[in-house]
Every structure is written in structure tokens, then in C-alpha cells.
């Protein structure tokens, strides 16, 4: 979305697709190990692992100062009803780098239908609600872009 809109934030936004969460977190651990020397340059880790249902906001684990900044950013997401930023969040896959001090947050969604599809033969693209999917993408893109484009780093 950022690329399509021609947006270039001040900092790099890295998208990582994880593997093996349910069977040992090998993807998250391997990422941490491969990037251990540069984790101080990781400003924020954002995980989306609850499906792409209607988003409501994010849960954040980090300092209160950073939480206040993210809550201000969250107001940009009010029009699509995904701007509530609460304390406590992250995700299993980003857990290894969070334990090394990287602040983390997870996208919160209305997940009542999650287990209708999760790891079943019904978990196919045709089940996606395009509007909910687009709201998730927009929520993640806005949060990632604004944090990456701030003049100052998100405080730890």
C-alpha cells in the first residue's frame, strides 16, 4: 500500500513472513538470531496473527511514553474504527525480539469466526471479507508508516 501510494518513510519498513509458530517459533527465533546485532535499530515490531477480520486497533507492549504516542497515531484510524491502542499486546512470532527489548504490538480484530477457518480446509481466499481485509491492511500500513516516518524514534 505504501509503495502503491508512493510513500517513502524516513526509516525502513520491513515485512517478515514467519514460519513454524505453532511448532517451536523457529522463524521468530531465527530472525532474532540473524538480526541480534541490529535489534537496537528495530523501532517497533507489529504482528498480525488473528485473522483479517474487522480490526478494532492494536495492543502494545512497551513504555507508557511510547503508548501515548501510538494512541495519538491511533486517532488517524478512527474513521475505519481501528484506532483503539491498548496496553498489552504483541504476538508469539515477534516475542523473541520483544524479549530483546524491541517494543511490540499486535493488530486486534473481531475474531469470533477465527476458529471457523483457522488450520482447516475452509481457510481459503474466498472466505475473506474484502472490506475487513482492506481495513486490516490500512490499519497496519498507517501504523507502520507513521512510526517509520516520525522525526524521533519511538521511545523504549
Describe the function of each predicted region.
Residues 1-69:
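Acidic/histidine-rich catalytic neighborhood of metal-dependent amide-processing enzymes
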Amino acid at each position: 500500500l505504501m509503495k502503491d501510494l508512493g510513500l517513502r518513510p524516513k526509516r525502513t519498513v520491513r515485512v517478515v513472513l514467519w514460519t513454524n509458530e505453532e511448532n517451536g517459533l523457529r522463524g521468530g527465533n531465527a530472525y532474532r538470531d540473524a538480526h541480534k546485532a541490529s535489534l537496537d535499530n528495530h523501532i517497533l515490531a507489529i504482528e498480525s496473527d488473528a485473522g483479517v477480520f474487522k480490526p478494532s486497533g492494536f495492543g502494545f507492549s512497551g513504555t507508557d511514553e511510547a503508548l501515548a504516542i501510538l494512541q495519538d497515531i491511533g486517532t488517524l484510524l478512527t474513521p475505519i474504527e481501528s484506532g483503539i491502542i491498548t496496553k498489552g499486546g504483541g504476538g508469539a512470532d515477534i516475542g523473541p525480539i520483544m524479549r530483546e527489548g524491541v517494543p511490540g504490538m499486535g493488530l486486534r480484530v473481531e475474531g469470533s469466526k477465527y476458529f471457523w477457518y483457522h488450520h482447516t480446509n475452509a481457510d481459503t481466499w474466498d472466505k475473506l471479507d474484502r472490506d475487513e481485509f482492506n481495513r486490516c491492511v490500512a490499519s497496519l500500513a498507517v501504523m507502520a508508516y507513521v512510526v517509520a516516518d516520525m522525526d524521533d524514534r519511538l521511545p523504549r
